[in-house]
């Protein structure tokens, strides 16, 4: 139990298939039919790289995969959450999405994007939104006072001069 929520009572389903390739059938059809049956509000796909076999740099292949995710979103009235990684040499800063691996279509797909990165032994959470200005980045810390309530906690908001330092 955390913050009044008993996780044993939450209706969560996990896909445990050993092989899931969402760029092709029958995998696409099975996911669509499963989601129709379960009616999730949120479909987390984590990590994206393990759920497909396309060339992430090929815009055509990426566009087809993202079109399938958009179809799921619209047909089933759910939110699709993609967990994706940055390039190893990606610079931080205001446009964190520019550092994502692969085609820029992956960055453009998101209506709201959250970016978590480590800098100087701290976690920084930044965001981008399609229809609203981004809020200031924040520092997060993993708080583990006891095993039952381990959580991330906002410990500070980054001020303008600190944000400039992240971009360098």
Task: Identify what each model region corresponds to.
Residues 16, 129, 156:
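Pocket-edge structural micro-motifs
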Residues 1-60, 64, 71, 118:
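Conserved inter-motif catalytic segment of the P-loop NTP-binding fold
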Residues 21-22, 56, 100, 156, ...:
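Charge-dense, low-complexity intrinsically disordered segments
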Residues 7, 24, 142-144, 154, ...:
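Generic detector of low-complexity/intrinsically disordered segments
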Residues 27, 106, 123, 165-166:
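Alpha-helical structural motif
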Residues 42, 50, 60-152:
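Phosphate-binding/switch region of NTP-binding enzymes
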Residues 39, 148-168:
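DNA transaction DNA-binding modules
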């Amino acid at each position: 139990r955390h913050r009044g929520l008993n996780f044993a009572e939450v209706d969560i389903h996990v896909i445990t298939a050993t092989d899931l390739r969402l760029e092709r059938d029958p995998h696409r059809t099975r996911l669509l039919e499963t989601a129709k049956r379960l009616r999730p509000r949120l479909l987390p796909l984590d990590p994206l790289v393990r759920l497909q076999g396309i060339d992430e740099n090929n815009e055509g292949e990426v566009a087809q995969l993202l079109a399938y995710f958009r179809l799921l979103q619209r047909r089933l009235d759910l939110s699709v959450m993609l967990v994706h990684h940055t390039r190893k040499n990606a610079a931080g800063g205001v446009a964190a999405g520019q550092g994502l691996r692969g085609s820029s279509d992956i960055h453009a797909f998101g209506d709201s994007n959250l970016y978590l990165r480590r800098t100087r032994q701290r976690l920084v959470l930044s965001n981008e939104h399609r229809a609203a200005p981004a809020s200031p980045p924040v520092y997060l810390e993993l708080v583990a006072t006891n095993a039952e309530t381990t959580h991330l906690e906002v410990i500070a908001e980054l001020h303008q001069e600190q944000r400039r330092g992240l971009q360098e």
